[in-house]
Amino acid sequence: MSTTDTLPVTLDRITQAVEAVGLIPFVSNTGQVAAILPNRTIRIAVPEGHPAQGVADYPRFFDPSHADQIASAVRRLNASTYLPKVTSGTTETGAIALHLQHTFNWVVGATDDQVTAEVSQFIMAAVAMMNQLDIMFPDQWTKEGTNA
């Protein structure tokens, strides 16, 4: 049996992985790196002593009258995808918000290839899930008029 030593996963290594995906990382002084895309912001937080967390908030909110449809969509998406997982919650104004989350499993460290692959998978899967939500719940305000 052989062993492989792997380095701890740090904010710098995650930042390099975001760059390797071809995105510009935005690094905060709170231990987070973000990839900011048109209408999408995907963050990875690296809290000291805790697993890294990938998070993204869907940029739209839903009226409470759509709660059953949202709950059904959340169940279907979570049942059909490994990552990220999506949850719904109620905002202070009563609207329904959707939150995407993934906990990275790098307890004993990871190789550069592993970090890059998992960061890439999370970013691409989060964008794909948000695109699915866009298809399931079209935004009537973004449609072009017939005379546009």
Task: Give the ranges of each region predicted by the language model.
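Charge-rich, low-complexity N-terminal segments
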Residues: 1-45, 89
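A generic structural signal for beta-strand entry/edge sites
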Residues: 30-32, 49-53, 93-99
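Amphipathic alpha-helical hairpins
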Residues: 37, 92-93, 148
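Long, continuous compositionally biased terminal/linker segments
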Residues: 38-68
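Short, internal acidic amphipathic alpha-helical interface segments
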Residues: 57-101
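A short acidic/glycine-rich loop-to-helix N-cap element
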Residues: 106-120
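Helix-rich interaction surfaces within compact, conserved domain-sized segments
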Residues: 119, 123-127
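Short, highly charged C-terminal tails/helix-capping segments
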Residues: 134-148
